[in-house]
């Protein structure tokens, strides 16, 4: 009798796991071809604005295919956020270890932990499917969705979705909406300067402004421009389809040299 109960419990557990996997995996697989109408972060921000009584809040989200986006925009966000994006499977473990060490040093000095190591794939996972905040549960789900995305989407699709769901201002999502809002031009016409400025606010697009850059944003923009040159500019996007070993020149080599 007791064995029958255990078998039934195990069977229901396996069924529950299978159902949970299907419910979470199907949207990820579908979004390889279907453009997302909304993201979890957009929904959370809209709900927060409603609770706060922000009656004039508006979500500005305009999808643009990768071919309709300046290659400078893709290179800028890769240079700013995840220079080894073409070469990893969603997680940059060396950057994670460096971030842990850096934040431990900051903690000893009683300073805030300021360094993160989220890859572009991880940011897509949390922006699309999860909620803001920090917890072990959310980080576990983020890792799960990141792995699903990397297994089912090509790199070109990951960067395309990222460029469309990343936040560049209060209620402004995606490079098309940001380009139209801040530069009065379509994303296809963004130059290196505009793209680097937009990428410079990504750590905190509410505090930092594309149209009113602080000293920090200006310095970060200039750093991103230098990194874009070191990566080889738009030619670096060829690595998304046919990744090779990172060359020994440019920004990637300098980072790799520090890691060894």
Language model features: what each stretch is:
Residues 2-260:
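Juxtamembrane regions of bacterial inner-membrane/periplasmic proteins
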């Amino acid at each position: 009798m007791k064995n029958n109960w255990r078998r039934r419990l195990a069977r229901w557990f396996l069924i529950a796991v299978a159902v949970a996997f299907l419910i979470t995996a199907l949207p990820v697989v579908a979004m390889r071809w279907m453009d997302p109408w909304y993201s979890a972060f957009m929904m959370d921000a809209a709900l927060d604005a409603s609770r706060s009584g922000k009656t004039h809040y508006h979500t500005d989200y305009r999808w643009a295919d990768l071919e309709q986006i300046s290659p400078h925009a893709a290179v800028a966000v890769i240079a700013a956020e995840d220079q080894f994006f073409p070469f990893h499977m969603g997680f940059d473990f060396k950057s994670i270890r460096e971030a842990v060490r850096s934040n431990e040093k900051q903690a000893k000095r009683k300073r805030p932990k300021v360094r993160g190591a989220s890859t572009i794939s991880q940011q897509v996972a949390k922006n699309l499917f999860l909620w803001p905040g920090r917890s072990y549960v959310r980080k576990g789900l983020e890792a799960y969705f990141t792995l699903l995305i990397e297994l089912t989407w090509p790199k070109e699709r990951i960067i395309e979705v990222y460029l469309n769901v990343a936040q560049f201002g209060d209620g402004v999502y995606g490079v098309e909406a940001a380009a139209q809002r801040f530069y009065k031009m379509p994303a296809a016409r963004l130059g290196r300067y505009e793209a680097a400025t937009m990428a410079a606010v990504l750590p905190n697009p509410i505090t930092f402004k594309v149209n009113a850059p602080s000293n920090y944003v200006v310095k970060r923009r200039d750093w991103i421009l230098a990194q874009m040159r070191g990566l080889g500019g738009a030619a670096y996007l060829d690595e998304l389809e046919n990744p090779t070993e990172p060359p020994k020149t440019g920004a990637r080599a300098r980072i790799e040299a520090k890691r060894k």
